[in-house]
Amino acid sequence: AGVIHDERGFLAMKRSENQPSPGKWEFPGGTIELDESPEDALLREFREELSIEVSIIKKAGVWQHTYPFFHVDIHVFLVESSELESIQMTVHSEKKWISSSKDFDLDWLEADIPIVEDLLDKFY
C-alpha cells in the first residue's frame, strides 16, 4: 500500500461498487505478483489503479491481517508524486484528502484500520 502525504493531508481512495469490498476506503496498492518485489508491485499498482507514477520515500512497515479465508501482509510505503492532479481512477469511485483525526472516520477496509490508527498516532 502506498500512503501519499502532502500539505493537503493523506490520500484515501474509495473502492468502486464493482470491486471486492465495495465502498470501503483504503490506501492504494494491491497484490504482489510472482517474482515481483513489494516496491515494484507498489509502483505497478499506482500506474494501474491511478495512472500516475510515484516515488518511494521510505518503507513505513509491514502490517498483517487475517480475513476468514486468507491472510495478507501489507507492505506500506510513504510515497510522493508530481502527478497527483492527473489521477485517473480505474478501481476507485472517489478520492479524499484526510487532514484531521475527524477525517479518518471513514468506512475503512478492515486490513487498513491498523495503518490508519498508526498514522493517527504519529500525525494527529
Q: For the regions a protein language model found, what residue spans apply to each?
A:
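A SAM-dependent methyltransferase catalytic signature shared across enzymes that methylate proteins
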Residues: R47, S51-K58
